[in-house]
């Protein structure tokens, strides 16, 4: 019986490994390379690079924030500006949780106001 459980675990591990490698290969075919940073098991940032021959160039950067329940509260994206050689804010998604629902609000960066501006028509509330 223990051998059967061990065999099942090995099969699951092999399938997971193959799926991970397939995902990695698919990302490589798109010429995008992903580099994630985790803290205490939570992804706090991810930088995406474009591959051009032997060169990697900055493309997108994502930052994530969480509440005390490890629920994502913010997902901010930035685009690389090659002219200014820096990251520029692009989009911010904020999540609000209550006992029965989660509300998702989308904000677009406004460089003139130097702030994220709510896009009200994209606000969505869903039951848990």
Predicted regions and their residues:
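Bacterial N-terminal signal peptides that target proteins for export
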Residues: 1-11
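Buried hydrophobic residues that stabilize the cores of well-folded domains
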Residues: 5, 22-128
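Bacterial N-terminal signal peptides
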Residues: 10-20
């Amino acid at each position: 019986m223990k051998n059967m459980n061990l065999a099942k675990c090995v099969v699951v591990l092999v399938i997971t490994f193959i799926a991970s490698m397939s995902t990695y290969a698919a990302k490589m075919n798109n010429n995008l390379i992903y580099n994630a940073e985790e803290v205490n098991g939570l992804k706090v940032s991810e930088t995406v690079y474009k591959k051009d021959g032997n060169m990697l160039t900055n493309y997108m950067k994502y930052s994530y924030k969480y509440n005390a329940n490890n629920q994502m509260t913010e997902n901010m994206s930035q685009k690389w500006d090659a002219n200014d050689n820096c990251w520029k804010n692009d989009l911010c998604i904020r999540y609000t949780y209550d006992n029965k629902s989660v509300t998702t609000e989308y904000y677009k960066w406004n460089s003139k106001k130097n702030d994220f501006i709510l896009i009200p028509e994209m606000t969505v509330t869903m039951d848990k």
